[in-house]
């Protein structure tokens, strides 16, 4: 139930002592971090003890000290047995914080990286996390990194095919002794991410003072762009045959520009 110089998670441990010869009595086992609940009994040439940890988390050792074992002639061991030590850990890790975030600006979209930063109550092994967006599994491979033994970051890159909607996740982990967290972490202590992979389009381009594919006679033209959704910045208008004298400004959901022809007679386009 225990690995030497590592961990054990058993509620009781069975300690087996193997002497070099037949003994005249049960050897004395010295225990730190626990108590002997069943005294040693001979099993063939071995002696078997049951040891109970003193607490849920305990550094433990067992050893047969000098003089702790004697043969039938009364000769005692002049050297202690190997000191077998381990850490008893019966406490499962818990989550202290779970922070969901995304790189970039605003909602997540193609090539942005979604991260879940996990801070458990103790050092843990690499977690296992899954991510969904809009209820469907995200296409990217989850990768893991650490900022400390008890702080882990799970990352997934947004794919263009990922479904629009809120990002959900499920993460589990185990401590270094192998104790699993009681239940998966499915809610963030802070942060939320929404995937928006819908590419905006310009649904209408209107030019006041001109007829498309015909003529215009204004000294300046007012160009109004209507996008398919709210934009995060003013769209770039390209003009041939003229210059933008007033940069685009938002007017409700539209963007308005003032364009001046380069000369008195000019073929013009805006796009």
Predicted regions span which residues?
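Non-catalytic beta-sheet/beta-sandwich ligand-binding modules that flank or precede catalytic cores
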Residues: 1-271
